[in-house]
Regions:
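Membrane topogenic helices and adjacent juxtamembrane segments
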Residues: 1-31
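Conserved phosphate/pyrophosphate-binding and hydrolysis machinery centered on Walker-type P-loop NTPases
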Residues: 5, 9, 31-39, 79-83
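Solvent-exposed aromatic/hydrophobic patches embedded in short alpha-helical segments
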Residues: 7-11, 68-69, 89, 93-98
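Amphipathic alpha-helical interaction modules
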Residues: 21-62
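Amphipathic protein-protein interaction modules
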Residues: 46-87
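Amphipathic alpha-helical binding modules
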Residues: 76-107
Length: 107
């Protein structure tokens, strides 16, 4: 729903650019092409987050800090299943990045 709203408001490309920018700032480039389909984009973000949680936890925390995902939202998640956790974190990351893009466009 979040990505379809971005598409409706013609901000999908800006969302991809923002995500790419913040992942690059965290020294964990995502390099998602602006031509990527929304479903693939969500999966790419989720896969990258899964790998960070599993293999590079410090970099994962740095990424959350750079993107400014609220810590209390992360603490509410159940970390027992890494695949599910990465899916939930990917949603929070995309949600926060969408807020940035939307506010920048509106104001």
């Amino acid at each position: 729903a979040l990505i379809s709203q971005a598409e409706e408001e013609s901000l999908y490309f800006k969302l991809i650019e923002q995500v790419n920018k913040d992942f690059a700032l965290a020294n964990e480039p995502l390099d998602a092409p602006t031509s990527i389909f929304p479903f693939e984009f969500k999966n790419l973000v989720q896969e990258k987050i899964y790998k960070l949680i599993h293999y590079k936890f410090a970099e994962y925390l740095n990424l959350l800090y750079i993107i400014d995902v609220p810590e209390e939202q992360i603490k509410k998640l159940d970390g027992s299943d890494l695949v599910e956790l990465s899916e939930q974190v990917a949603f929070l990351v995309l949600q926060r990045e969408w807020q940035k893009v939307w506010f920048r466009n509106k104001y």
